[in-house]
Amino acid sequence: MLIFTFIGINLMSVAQETQLSTIASNGWANNSVNTVIFRKNSLISFNDSQYAAYYDQEQNVVLAKRKIGSTSWTLVTTPYKGDATDAHKSISIMVDGDGFLHIAWGQHNNNLNYAKSVSAGSLTLGNKETMLSAKENKVSYPEFYKLANDDLLFFYRDGGSGNGNLMINRYSLKTKKWTRRQDGMIDGEGQRNAYWQVAVDQVGTIHLSWVWRESPDVASNHDLCYAKSTDGGLTWLKSTDEKYSLPITAANAEYALKIPQKSELINQTSMFADAKGKVFIAGYWRDARETIPQYHLVFKTDNHWEVSKLNFRKTAFSLSGGGTKQIPISRPQIIVWPNGKHYAVGLLFRDAERGNKVSIALNDQLGSANWKVKDLTQNSIGDWEPSYDTELWKSKGILSLFLQHVTQVDGEGKANQPPTVVQALDWKPKNK
């Protein structure tokens, strides 16, 4: 086996193409804010360029850019800061079809922080802007997605944990303006709220899945629901193409899987949808009568939902309480690609059992038990969670991961750690 050594993190080659590049050496590392899984996105590509964003040790928002395939990055420290001491307040970026960079940062039940670049391809940001002004004072979990026509979607939560609503805005390349697509399309009826994950496939269908949470206590997470939209978020359908009557509630939601409360079910994981609209949802929970939480994949076959359990974990743990938790495993990212008549799948994660390295579980025939786990790094990455360049994977089949060694203290705590190296790891499966 070939072993490559780079500054910061050692890389083990498990594919035909692997490359590690150092973006910067001054990444904020006192919590996991730079590496939480709900950064959509931490890295993003457009044409031949890739962009990155992170908080430095002074809590400045820093932007970076390189040519795809290069290991040399250009950096710009923006005039904006975020409260990096709250790990919810991550940075999300996306590039629209005209090449303008859009960014949102520093959000946890507060006023919208949003800006875009002054010109196409630029790392210089303009002034902070509103999108629509209304319902932009209690923003959490900002996420950007790109539609097939290169317009953008912006998802966020309006309100707090337990009573927040999903909001969806759309940015038009033609008008250069944001409009509201949905306001509270998932209704917790004052009793619960949805923690969602989204995937947009190559034809532009929006796929949305979520768990319900009954209170700020993560132990109250339960069930896995699904909806999709083929018209940019205006109307929503079940996987059977039955039209939803909005809002979606606990009573009329499609349940991909029923999972009880107190099952160590994690919220805000990941999903993937291929060009044919096939949906794959990754998460972890503890099955009934078992003590150890395991990673699971939930996916739709011709007419029903199936579950594949990755049964390799040996260590029990419990999810309970509020704030950002220090958990021995990361939330998983999922990538899927065709492999002959089957689907191959990669589940990206970090597990204390494996020394907190960057790991990937590979299966060249989804539905089989043929899982092989490999480590992509030789050293610990701390409390990192995986986030990747969704557009580069769609366009070129290259997995580009944001890497940084970070420390997360339980219950929204702050460590006392010097800054660490921020890197991008590019990896391509052998059979893609």
Model-based region annotation:
Residues 16-432:
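Extracellular, repeat-based ectodomains that mediate carbohydrate processing or recognition
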Residues 1-17:
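Bacterial Sec-dependent N-terminal signal peptides
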